[in-house]
């Protein structure tokens, strides 16, 4: 299952966004208001929970400065990645788009497609708060 957020233009440099997203504690700023839990688990991982959803642990998987950051599920039960692609538009402007890729059975995919789609849209929409 592949989902993508709308591309969002931010008045920050690509390097600034990359550095901000490289620090996992900054993801709390991006979370939707319906967040029930957010906890940093070391330098490269965090766990979060949204109301009515199971808690999810994310771990930093890959960083390619200043254009790409990949987070992945720390559990193999629900394997997925969340990738942030950062494009430099000008010296102080960037475009960010989030991509969610996961391997789920059709029933699970049907249940989570809506909530996950809204979730990555919210994360992208909150990028200007960084």
Model feature map: region roles:
Residues 16-18, 56-58, 70, 81, ...:
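Short acidic, gly/pro-rich beta-turn/loop elements at beta-sheet edges
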Residues 2, 62-64, 79-83:
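Soluble, non-transmembrane catalytic domains of enzymes that act on hydrophobic metabolites at membranes
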Residues 29, 38-77:
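Glycine-rich portal/gate segments that line the openings of hydrophobic small-molecule binding cavities
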Residues 2, 8, 30, 69, ...:
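Amphipathic alpha-helical hairpins
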Residues 4-6, 58, 72, 84:
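Structured catalytic core of nucleotide-sugar glycosyltransferases
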Residues 14, 61-66, 86-95:
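A short, structured loop/turn motif at beta-sheet edges
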Residues 74-125:
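Beta-strand/loop substructures that line and gate deep hydrophobic ligand-binding cavities in soluble
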Residues 1-39, 45:
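Hydrophobic ligand-binding cavity/cleft-lining segments
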């Amino acid at each position: 299952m592949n989902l993508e957020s709308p591309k969002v233009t931010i008045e920050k440099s690509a390097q600034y966004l990359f550095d901000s997203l490289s620090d996992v504690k900054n993801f709390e700023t991006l979370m939707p208001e319906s967040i029930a839990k957010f906890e940093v688990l070391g330098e490269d991982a965090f766990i979060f929970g949204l109301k009515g959803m199971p808690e999810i642990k994310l771990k930093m998987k890959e960083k390619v400065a200043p254009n790409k950051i990949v987070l992945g599920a720390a559990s193999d039960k629900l394997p997925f990645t969340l990738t942030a692609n950062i494009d430099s538009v000008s010296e102080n402007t960037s475009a960010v788009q989030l991509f969610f890729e996961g391997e789920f059975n059709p029933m699970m995919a049907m249940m989570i497609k809506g909530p996950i789609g809204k979730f990555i849209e919210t994360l992208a929409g909150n990028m200007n708060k960084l």
